[in-house]
Amino acid sequence: MSCMACKIKGKASNVCKFKDTLTPVLEEIAEADGLVLGSPIYFGDVTGQMRTFLERLAFPWLSYNDYSLTAPKRMPVVLMETMNGLPDRNNSQDYGSMEHCIAAALGQPEHVYAYNNYQVKNYANYELGSFSEEAKRQYRDTHWKEDLQKAFDVGKRMAERICYGL
């Protein structure tokens, strides 16, 4: 199936026409009231899997007639990122060019960041010599409640926007 199947005259679609296990998810998003997306950040960007998902989600919204981006409906969006970087020292590019597509089609997203991730239970079992397990644990223990509160607060704002049409 061509990646242009969603653009066939008279059969255009706002959902990717390629049928697989992602199809029902994309169909549900088209009817959703809000969307939360999350990705670890590797090499300053979202994962390849997230990028592929976002392309499958957003490409059908793109019109090659006028280059507009039109989703089935607008909705609150939250973009979450986890990374090894710190607030003052990270190379995250957020959701890159796909964030523009999300903002244009769905609405301006809110961001939630979780920094300096404590990645594994026992650092001694992995080739992670540049990290201090103790420093990672201390950072997590110090910031965990704050990270949970940020996630709660953004979820609350999303629910208010959905319920009250803000």
Residue map of PLM features:
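Short aromatic-enriched loop/helix-cap "lid" or pocket-rim segments at secondary-structure transitions
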Residues: 3, 91-92, 121-126
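Short, solvent-exposed beta-strand-terminating loops
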Residues: 109-125
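Short, catalytically relevant binding-site loops at active-site mouths
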Residues: 42-44, 85-86, 118-119
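N-terminal beta1-alpha1-beta2 submodule of the flavodoxin-like/Rossmannoid cofactor-binding fold
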Residues: 1-67, 130-166
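Short, glycine-/small-residue-rich phosphate/pyrophosphate-handling segment
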Residues: 48-49, 62-113
